[in-house]
Amino acid sequence: GYASMEGSYRIEGGMMALVAALASQIAPPRLRLDAPVAEIDQSGIVTFANGDTITAERIVLAIPPRVIATIKITPDFDAAVQQSLINIPTWMGGQAKFVATYARPFWRQQGLSGDAMGRHGPMVEIHDASAKDGTPGALFGFIGVPAAQRDGQSDALRTACIAQFGRLFGPEALTPQKIELRDWAYAPQTAT
């Protein structure tokens, strides 16, 4: 990893690099992609949403606690454990993130870090998300608008985010090569 801001580190290649590294340690026939788990029997039988089953010696759930609560587990957890799984908030579960990519991180040539905090959004926290070598350049920001107010406003949010990048980093920020709005509040694997 490398530091992009004091006290925080990023994984070169992003989280997918971590996922790919972990997946490379698993024999391909044993790796199941796009296979949501529907049921786990504590004897080791795992049933997938499509009805397929496997038997596992060990089962590790590395998913948000609220998502664990959506899987049928036999024998069931006691009521207190079930309730605690539902009550544990998913970190970032209600958040949204906007990313804009550019041919290069032009803001660095202006002496700007790409990091910003703002109260006049829609983004409240912005960072340089460029690859370590600077190609492509990328800026991302966390949306500070509550999920209920974001609902159905994706196009307006994209426009407002680009405008905010323009105010902060200049006119070149108004013409990204690619943009993406990721709203975890509506992702069933993140927030339930």
Where are these regions (language model features)?
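Generic structural signal for small/hydrophobic residues in well-ordered secondary structure
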Residues: L22, V60, V99-A100, G141, ...
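Core beta-strand elements of the Rossmann-like FAD/NAD(P) dinucleotide-binding domain
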Residues: A49-R58
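Active-site/ligand-binding neighborhood in enzyme catalytic cores
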Residues: G1-P36, S43-G44, T55, A62, ...
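Conserved flavin/dinucleotide-binding core of flavoenzymes
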Residues: I45, I54, G94, Q109-T192
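Non-transmembrane alpha-helical segments in soluble domains
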Residues: V19-A23, A38, I162-F169
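Active-site rim elements
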Residues: S4-E12, Q83-T90, P146-D155, F165
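Central beta-strand plus flanking loop segment that forms part of the substrate or channel wall
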Residues: A80-Q110
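Active-site-adjacent segment of FAD-dependent monooxygenases/related oxidoreductases
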Residues: G1, V99, L181-W184
